[in-house]
From Swiss-Prot:
It is a multi-pass membrane protein. Residues 1-12 have a biased composition (Basic and acidic residues). Belongs to the major facilitator superfamily. Sugar transporter (TC 2.A.1.1) family. The gene is HXT17. This is Hexose transporter HXT17.
């Protein structure tokens, strides 16, 4: 376990408080950081955790992370809807030559992509609620908006424009969750578990995709509107889980301290760590957060203009957030998740729904691996290895599709062997994506920004994710209809750019508190040297203790040590 070497600080109440060196004095901590109260920062160790300690942390964070289930559920059911006969009859067009209903490329693209437009707008609109109403209440509000969108879609009958309006409102709620849930997770999570806990958001997104695939598989043989209305109706169950969960989880201690609610902030830190609010480590954490809030206040009120500040390196971090979220879509993952059923029918499989379930299963279990290892490997290594692995898989996938899938031309039968090989490399690709970029992109955005501009910066970064998801979702039917599997090479080029950007511009933040990450950026450390950077508060400590404590997985698995 590490101990801080910072001198003890005397912290006065209010934004203009003085912070000065004082000798260690043990005093009872009162509400609001009063004069002459001192926290002895030396030799204060984080609480030891046993089985119950870990379970409490993960159980408290899980309802927050369940917000990721909402966009995942939409991806899973939409991939099935566009191939359902009753859905096409209600919202498609009739082709007299074949006597069948179909979805045009434009309508199919809009059906998939309008959700993303709603998400982009929702993230921008609702992110500010986190600063005015608190993280928890803001999440409840966006979930209610999501439910309104679901009602509009379910009540649609032969009116595709009504369905699309519902889809946009549906997206407003999911987009708000995509900003607010990772934000709250990053602010209540212990430093050594932050990566894994934020990754739970992505894990639940993959869980939503998987269950979405299963739901449309189960209703695909219905011959009425229950074929698509039942999967839509199930979303009310998922939203209730989130709303009830918000009554149980702690509020962000950073938000509470910004509102001068210091006692509640200490209670929040204590609850997530299962210790007393008077525990010295809790007091030290509250002290550090308060110092960071005071430092931000000295810079003035937050504004949109501050996002472009070069002096505080916020602009650099905003560009990183935008590009990481953009690259997340340019991996090509939604090419498979949105159109997976369609793609695998094109390679000769009679039931593309079953293959989608296989892909959803690979996606879900691969993300579980990411949750377990992301705080051991680090952000940079995950992103670099992931980009390289996806690049190799996409090259092989596209090459087989171009050269081997149709040996007698596009109008001839497809090769079953080539089709099976494409499915195998799709699974490898999804493994590489789900264990690296899928969770880490959200971690990077959630932990990069100072609290003062966090809601604004995260909303812009996440909006770029949804904007690119819209573009890929809308234009993919046109592009694949024109260049077929050559489309994969476009994503290969993007993956090369991603690898280079991460290597040269993205710093390593594993083991650092949110306040220490701000110092990392401010000191201008080269990204490829950032893994060895030590925060000022830990300089001078022996090297083996210079990093924030990391979980001993053997102890965690055996539960042989730790107290609750």
């Amino acid at each position: 376990m590490q101990s801080s070497t910072e001198s003890d600080r005397d912290i006065q109440d209010g934004p203009d408080a003085d912070i000065h060196v004082a000798p260690p004095v043990e005093k009872e901590w009162s509400d609001g950081f009063d004069d002459n109260e001192v926290i002895n920062g030396d030799n204060v160790e984080p609480p030891k955790r046993g089985l119950i300690g870990y379970l409490v942390i993960y159980l408290l964070c899980y309802p927050i992370s369940f917000g990721g289930f909402l966009p995942g559920w939409d991806s899973g059911i939409t991939a099935g809807f566009i191939n359902m006969d009753n859905f096409k009859m209600n919202f498609g067009s009739y082709k007299h030559s074949t006597g069948e209903y179909y979805l045009s490329n434009v309508r199919m693209g809009l059906l998939v992509a309008m959700f993303s437009i709603g998400c982009a707008i929702g993230g921008l609109i609702f992110a500010r609620l986190a600063d005015t109403l608190g993280r928890r209440l803001a999440i409840v509000i966006v979930v209610l908006v999501y439910m309104v969108g679901a009602i509009i879609q379910i009540s649609s009958n032969h009116k595709w424009y009504q369905y699309f309006v519902g889809k946009i409102i549906y997206g407003l709620g999911a987009g708000g969750c995509s900003v607010l849930c990772p934000m709250l997770l990053s602010e209540i999570a212990p430093t050594d578990l932050r990566g894994g806990l934020v990754s739970l958001y992505q894990l639940n997104m993959t869980f939503g995709i998987f269950l979405g695939y299963c739901s449309v598989y189960g209703t695909r043989k219905y011959d009425n509107t229950a074929q698509w209305r039942v999967p839509l109706g199930l979303c009310f169950l998922w939203t209730l889980i989130i709303i009830i969960g918000m009554l149980l989880v702690p509020e962000s201690p950073r938000y509470l301290i910004e509102c001068e609610r210091h006692e509640e902030a200490r209670a929040s830190i204590a609850k997530i760590n299962k210790v007393s609010p008077e525990d010295p480590w809790v007091l030290k954490q509250a002290d550090e957060i308060n110092a960071g809030v005071l430092a931000q206040r000295e810079l003035g009120e937050a504004s949109w203009k501050e996002l472009f500040s070069v002096k505080t390196k916020v602009l650099q971090r905003l560009i990183t957030g935008i590009l990481v979220q953009t690259f997340l879509q340019l991996t090509g993952e939604n090419y498979f998740f949105f159109y997976g059923t369609t793609i695998f029918k094109s390679v000769g499989l009679t039931d593309g729904f079953e293959t989608s379930i296989v892909l959803g299963t690979v996606n879900f279990f691969s993300t579980i691996i990411a949750v377990m290892v992301v705080d051991k490997i680090g952000r940079r290594k995950c992103l670099l290895f992931g980009a390289a692995g996806m690049m190799a898989c996409m090259v092989i996938f596209a090459s087989i599709g171009v050269k081997c899938l149709y040996p007698h031309g596009q109008d001839g039968p497809s090769s079953k062997g080539a089709g099976n090989a494409m499915i195998v490399f799709t699974c490898f690709y999804i493994f590489c994506f789900a264990t690296t970029w899928a969770p880490v992109a959200y971690i990077v955005v959630a932990e990069s920004f100072p609290s003062k501009v966090k809601s604004r910066a995260m909303s812009i970064s996440t909006a770029c994710n949804w904007l690119w998801q819209f573009l890929i979702g809308f234009f993919t039917p046109f592009i694949t209809g024109s260049i077929h599997f050559y489309y994969g090479y476009v994503f290969v080029g993007c993956l090369v750019a991603m690898f280079l950007y991460v290597f040269f511009f993205l710093p390593e933040t594993i083991g650092l508190s949110l306040e220490e990450i701000q110092l990392l950026y401010e000191e201008g450390i080269k990204p490829w040297k950032s893994a060895s950077w030590v925060p000022p508060s830990r300089r001078g400590i022996p090297s083996e203790e210079s990093k924030t404590e990391k979980k001993d997985w053997k102890k965690f698995l055996k539960f042989s040590k730790g107290s609750d």
